[in-house]
């Protein structure tokens, strides 16, 4: 991803990689192959993923929409959108159930241009002959590889957070229930020896 100012135009550089035996018929084919490689490199870059992950956690929104016209217990979430940091655990779990049962379609949203700007800022070097090529590879990486992966990761993190909260709430509610006498107004004794 070195973008020197003196590097050749990407289309010119791609001419040297034309090889009909390998299925690379034109410079455009070679450039597409290079685009795929650069997109993979960007997608695998831990620093880029960390930046975009943090951006998604701060600015992302969860949206759920009804998949059909029928009424269900999930009607509250038929046209629902909430910032990720403000979602309550019970909302996440209900939305997940609604999606699993086929009543809801759920997506995690982040303004595409905001995500692409953060990616380009980390990668593109202004003035480089390859600048437009790198911008194109950034868009491909973001749309095809990075964002879908981050969306799945965000959903998984939300579900994990919601489940942990539900377990803690259950534990808090269970303790007093277990500590009360089994029969009200009667003393219960254990006579087992040992």
Task: Please state what every model-predicted region is.
Residues 190-194:
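A short acidic Gly-Thr/Ser loop motif
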């Amino acid at each position: 991803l070195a973008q020197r100012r003196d590097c050749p135009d990407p289309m010119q550089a791609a001419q040297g990689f034309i090889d009909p035996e390998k299925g690379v018929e034109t410079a455009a084919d070679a450039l597409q192959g290079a685009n795929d490689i650069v997109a993979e490199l960007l997608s695998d870059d831990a620093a880029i993923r960390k930046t975009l992950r943090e951006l998604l956690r701060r600015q992302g929104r969860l949206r759920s929409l009804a998949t059909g016209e029928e009424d269900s217990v999930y009607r509250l979430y038929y046209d629902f959108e909430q910032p990720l940091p403000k979602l309550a655990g019970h909302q996440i779990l209900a939305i997940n159930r609604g999606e699993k049962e086929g009543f809801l379609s759920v997506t995690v949203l982040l303004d595409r241009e905001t995500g692409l700007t953060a990616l380009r800022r980390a990668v593109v070097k202004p003035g480089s002959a390859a600048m437009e090529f790198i911008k194109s590879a950034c868009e491909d990486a973001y749309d095809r590889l990075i964002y879908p992966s981050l969306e799945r990761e965000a959903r998984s993190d939300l579900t994990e957070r919601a489940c942990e909260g539900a377990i803690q709430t259950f534990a808090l509610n269970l303790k007093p229930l277990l500590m009360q006498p089994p029969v009200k107004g009667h003393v219960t004794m254990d006579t087992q020896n040992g």
